[in-house]
Amino acid sequence: MEPRVGNKYRLGRKIGSGSFGEIYLGTHIQTNEEVAIKLENVKTKHPQLLYESKLYRILQGGTGVPNIKWFGVEGDYNTLVMDLLGPSLEDLFNFCSRKLSLKSVLMLADQMINRVEYFHSKSFLHRDLKPDNFLMGLGRRANQVHIIDFGLAKKYRDNTTHQHIPYRENKNLTGTARYASMNTHLGIEQSRRDDLESLGYILMYFLKGSLPWQGLKAGTKKQKYERISEKKVSTSIESLCRGYPSEFASYFHYCRSLRFDDKPDYGYLKRIFRDLFIREGFQFDYVFDWTILKYQQSQLTAPPSRGLVSPAVGTSAGLPPGLTSIDRYGGEEEGGRPPMDSSRRRMSGALENSGNLSSRGPMMPSSSLFAQSAGSSRRVTSEELQRCRTGAGLRNSPVVTTPEGKRSSSTRKHYDSAIKGIETLQVSDERFHHH
């Protein structure tokens, strides 16, 4: 008899693994809906899945938070059934030759700040923000950023009184060193400001292709963390952001100006990036760099007799081919955890397939189309972009022919409408069940 979970889901092939368990593809017995099923042995020394399921339950209903279908015990395993999601931003960053355009980064930044703000509104810090922990959705949620992996999350205030946790020092590094805030490296208890600083490092990583403290050599992990810390502390904000719009430096200056228990002005941070987006003349059309690469790739691989292949071909609109087989569960490069948390490893996020991205070889054809660095939507003709948007099921951006004074207002309205549309896209098919 085929293995079943919760008497509702058929357990399929393994699609990923983590330090404390494994992830399988599941199928709803009646509807054939595909889901991700996380399994953790009940005899594991430090169970993690129950803790994570409780956080998912607290966060349920939030935009960009995976829906939990079922949690319980099946035989020897704690079991969590959740939405199947698409590739991580790290996967897509790799697909785009490890550099993203300003337009793509700004479209992502708006959603990512929203995810962090929602997480904080529920009285929790994430404490391990990195590109691997943000996943795009599938199908009609293909352009929606999801936040995952709550294994290191910590409650920072009381739900009722909003009493903030006390300031402490001499804390061990918790999270991933590459994206950890300066205060985290200095041993200061994390608060909301630190999640936002980590997010800033992610954005610069996407723009620059790497961060100055990557690739440092050391004999031990502890020595490596120390070298990363030293390099990060000695790298000024101006140096880090040199050559990029001043808004990114403003973002870091704001984050580092916050006191330990300050509530960040998330609206201000979104606003400086939105104003930059509008000033650059971008359209909020959800045509990301990977959308364009996938479209170009489809033209190279399509038989001559066939018509244009839209970016919607594949598992979801705008997702690149080949990214349905990605293993995000490799080692923890530059990651650090406190001694008490050493067993709290994670199987972050649901994936569609397994397989190591780096071992797959080149994913894009070696064509002159890809000779330029991946990124700018301006490198594709307006006609191609029109086909791209139409094929992906995206509404065309309005053609702005108004005078300069009215253009900003028109673009801002379109921007606000677009982001509101993706942020309110919510479908809850089932209620959370715990057995």
Curated annotation (Swiss-Prot):
<dbReference type="InterPro" id="IPR000719">
    <property type="entry name" value="Prot_kinase_dom"/>
</dbReference>
<feature type="region of interest" description="Disordered">
    <location>
        <begin position="394"/>
        <end position="414"/>
    </location>
</feature>
<keyword id="KW-0963">Cytoplasm</keyword>
<feature type="domain" description="Protein kinase">
    <location>
        <begin position="9"/>
        <end position="278"/>
    </location>
</feature>
<dbReference type="InterPro" id="IPR017441">
    <property type="entry name" value="Protein_kinase_ATP_BS"/>
</dbReference>
<keyword id="KW-0808">Transferase</keyword>
<dbReference type="InterPro" id="IPR050235">
    <property type="entry name" value="CK1_Ser-Thr_kinase"/>
</dbReference>
<dbReference type="GO" id="GO:0004674">
    <property type="term" value="F:protein serine/threonine kinase activity"/>
</dbReference>
<dbReference type="InterPro" id="IPR008271">
    <property type="entry name" value="Ser/Thr_kinase_AS"/>
</dbReference>
<feature type="region of interest" description="Disordered">
    <location>
        <begin position="313"/>
        <end position="363"/>
    </location>
</feature>
<comment type="subunit">
    <text>Monomer.</text>
</comment>
<keyword id="KW-0547">Nucleotide-binding</keyword>
<keyword id="KW-0723">Serine/threonine-protein kinase</keyword>
<protein>
    <recommendedName>
        <fullName>Casein kinase 1-like protein 12</fullName>
        <ecNumber>2.7.11.1</ecNumber>
    </recommendedName>
</protein>
<dbReference type="GO" id="GO:0005524">
    <property type="term" value="F:ATP binding"/>
</dbReference>
<dbReference type="Pfam" id="PF00069">
    <property type="entry name" value="Pkinase"/>
</dbReference>
<feature type="binding site">
    <location>
        <begin position="15"/>
        <end position="23"/>
    </location>
    <ligand>
        <name>ATP</name>
    </ligand>
</feature>
<dbReference type="GO" id="GO:0106310">
    <property type="term" value="F:protein serine kinase activity"/>
</dbReference>
<comment type="function">
    <text>Casein kinases are operationally defined by their preferential utilization of acidic proteins such as caseins as substrates. It can phosphorylate a large number of proteins.</text>
</comment>
<feature type="binding site">
    <location>
        <position position="38"/>
    </location>
    <ligand>
        <name>ATP</name>
    </ligand>
</feature>
<dbReference type="GO" id="GO:0005737">
    <property type="term" value="C:cytoplasm"/>
</dbReference>
<dbReference type="InterPro" id="IPR011009">
    <property type="entry name" value="Kinase-like_dom_sf"/>
</dbReference>
<keyword id="KW-0418">Kinase</keyword>
<keyword id="KW-0067">ATP-binding</keyword>
<comment type="similarity">
    <text>Belongs to the protein kinase superfamily. CK1 Ser/Thr protein kinase family. Casein kinase I subfamily.</text>
</comment>
<feature type="active site" description="Proton acceptor">
    <location>
        <position position="128"/>
    </location>
</feature>
